[in-house]
Amino acid sequence: MAAACRSVKGLVAVITGGASGLGLATAERLVGQGASAVLLDLPNSGGEAQAKKLGNNCVFAPADVTSEKDVQTALALAKGKFGRVDVAVNCAGIAVASKTYNLKKGQTHTLEDFQRVLDVNLMGTFNVIRLVAGEMGQNEPDQGGQRGVIINTASVAAFEGQVGQAAYSASKGGIVGMTLPIARDLAPIGIRVMTIAPGLFGTPLLTSLPEKVCNFLASQVPFPSRLGDPAEYAHLVQAIIENPFLNGEVIRLDGAIRMQP
């Protein structure tokens, strides 16, 4: 007999990058469906105000995902407030635009910029995964043997990186590459691991661009020909949580776009 799908109601989710964009949309959806959420974001991110807007079932945990101590403190806050951690959604990330070598300017991509993007996007994601897995491993398994769900955020840039995206594509490609082995690592203790690879979404990073640029980017999406709504990302997060047979896979959420150079 197939296992019953698990409702998000009553679950506790830690969401990195939770103060804005995809992370905030995820928190809004999960809290709206009866879950509790911990917004893990930088101290100056405005996360405290966002958590207050979401009510008593949401708290803010100021943290840098690259810091072991910060993430441990955030997880302790989650456990102290809500008793456990059932779900982790990794949305924290940064980007830089820089060619490997710019002939006109005579400039090379700095190692510092490359390292910083990998530190936040790839190392930060892994840091949260390894620490939250330890917390989830202490949960009592549900009737299907599940103790937790971890959902990471990659990007279509992991597959079709554009000019100037060497660092960003490398970081997101790393997330794609580690999804299956980590899912296999954690399968014996009942923790699922999934990754979403979004295309062009209406997050602050894009919506802050001139309207003409946003419209052009939206026109590149085959169908629907628009930017993705962060609520659609959040909807997929919920679907992954609720479907116990989704594991070890990367799902593109991109309106069929294939990025050009």
From Swiss-Prot:
It is linked to HSD10 mitochondrial disease: An X-linked multisystemic disorder with highly variable severity. Age at onset ranges from the neonatal period to early childhood. Features include progressive neurodegeneration, psychomotor retardation, loss of mental and motor skills, seizures, cardiomyopathy, and visual and hearing impairment. Some patients manifest lactic acidosis and metabolic acidosis. The modification N6-acetyllysine is found at residues 53, 69, 99, 105, 212. The gene is HSD17B10. Changing residue 20 to F: Decreased dehydrogenase activity. Does not affect mitochondrial tRNA 5'-end processing. Does not affect tRNA methylation. GO terms for biological process: androgen metabolic process; bile acid biosynthetic process; brexanolone metabolic process; C21-steroid hormone metabolic process; estrogen metabolic process; fatty acid beta-oxidation; fatty acid metabolic process; isoleucine catabolic process. This is 3-hydroxyacyl-CoA dehydrogenase type-2. It comes from the Eukaryota. Ubiquitously expressed in normal tissues but is overexpressed in neurons affected in AD.
